[in-house]
């Protein structure tokens, strides 16, 4: 529910922080860099032998992590990851010491799991960086295009926990080390331009009469009530309440900071869309900022919607048109071209 007091307080705090930042302005150098970070993030969707795709490699136990690949119908991961770990470091001009970092990586922030309120692995990373660079260091973690990416090393038979506080700490420490490596090698930006472009998309809602929706609905209705899985019960409820009429406004922001750009998405963008945005970017460093200023649910590829799976289930996981991913990518593409030309 909308909390009027919280929103009013939030505006006041934002204003106070802005004024404090303005008062503390000082000459600084922006340094930018990136490196590959592999072995921590994995594509969590798997292609099955019947051509479908799903969350996890085993149909009977989709979240299990100790699966023998010989005992499943899984053919392998259904997509790539984005291993780029990006850092934008703001350093003091006189000393070269960093006092603010933007860190970007494509990995779900849901490692600790359960119903705890936690800063998860970005919090561990932040605290470790403070131990090195001082308590005054501000670290902003931005989640990249990771709608279909998580931390679970499926089929690798790791003897270590794949979720919980131990795993969160492992990832946080590893990324803190990577952040230090990148920022210590990062070179000053050749450009001092800071500019942002905003595009508001009119996004059609996912149609209720779509083939994917109707096929799922028919399969659920063919079952007896006592046979329904939890998500099937939820789907029926949401389907009955859902209206596909009209459009919704969704915001896309593209922010340039020197030689780097941050390209936003209003939900959990699939990694394939993030890689496409990066491929066509004219900038040296292009980072993706998912879950920005809105939450439309998952933003999968059209192929993923056709093949099924948790993240690609209409009405439950996505409510916008199947073309939303392309709309977001294209909006960022146009903004990138304009920012480069200016």
Range-by-range predicted roles:
Residues 1-342:
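Non-catalytic substrate/cofactor recognition surfaces at enzyme active-site rims
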């Amino acid at each position: 529910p909308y909390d009027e007091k919280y929103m009013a307080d939030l505006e006041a705090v934002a204003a106070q922080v802005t004024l404090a930042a303005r008062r503390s302005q000082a000459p600084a150098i922006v340094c930018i860099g990136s490196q590959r970070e592999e072995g921590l993030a994995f594509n969590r969707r798997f292609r099955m032998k019947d051509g479908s795709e799903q969350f996890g490699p085993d149909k009977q136990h989709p979240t299990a992590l100790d699966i023998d690949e010989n005992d499943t119908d899984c053919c392998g991961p259904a997509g790539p990851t984005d291993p780029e770990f990006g850092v934008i470091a703001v350093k003091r001009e006189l000393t070269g010491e960093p006092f603010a970092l933007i860190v970007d990586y494509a990995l779900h922030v849901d490692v600790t799991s359960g119903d705890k309120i936690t800063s998860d692995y970005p919090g561990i990373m932040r605290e470790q960086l403070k131990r090195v660079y001082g308590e005054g260091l501000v670290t902003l973690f931005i989640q990249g295009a990771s709608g279909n990416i998580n931390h679970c090393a499926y089929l690798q038979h790791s003897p270590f926990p794949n979720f919980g506080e131990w795993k969160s700490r492992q990832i946080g420490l590893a990324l803190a080390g990577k952040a230090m490596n990148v920022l210590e090698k990062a070179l000053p930006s050749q450009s001092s331009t800071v500019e942002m472009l905003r595009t508001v998309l009119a996004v059609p809602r996912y149609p209720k009469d779509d083939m994917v929706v109707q096929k799922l609905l028919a399969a659920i209705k063919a079952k007896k009530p006592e046979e329904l899985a939890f998500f099937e019960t939820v789907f029926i409820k949401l389907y009955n309440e859902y209206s596909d009429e009209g459009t919704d406004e969704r915001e896309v922001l593209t922010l340039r900071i020197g030689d780097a750009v941050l390209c936003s998405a209003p939900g959990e963008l699939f990694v394939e869309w993030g890689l496409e945005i990066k491929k066509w970017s004219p900038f040296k460093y292009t980072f993706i900022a998912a879950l920005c200023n809105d939450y439309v649910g998952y933003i999968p590829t059209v192929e993923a919607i056709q093949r099924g799976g948790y993240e690609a289930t209409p009405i439950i996981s996505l409510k916008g048109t199947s073309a939303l991913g392309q709309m977001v990518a294209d909006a960022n593409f146009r903004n990138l071209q304009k920012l480069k030309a200016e």
